[in-house]
């Protein structure tokens, strides 16, 4: 989804 949280989860 959109948002910083979504990016961190992918790390």
Swiss-Prot record:
Coiled coil spans: none
Swiss-Prot/TrEMBL GO biological process terms: neuropeptide signaling pathway
Subcellular location: Secreted
Keywords: Amidation, Neuropeptide, Secreted
Sites of Leucine amide modification: 11
Annotated GO CC locations: extracellular region
Protein family (similarity comment): Belongs to the FARP (FMRF amide related peptide) family.
Protein function: FMRFamides and FMRFamide-like peptides are neuropeptides.
Name recorded for this polypeptide: Extended FMRFamide-9
Originating organism: Tyrannophasma gladiator (Gladiator)
Taxonomy of the source species: Eukaryota, Metazoa, Ecdysozoa, Arthropoda, Hexapoda
């Amino acid at each position: 989804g959109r948002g910083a949280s979504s990016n961190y989860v992918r790390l």
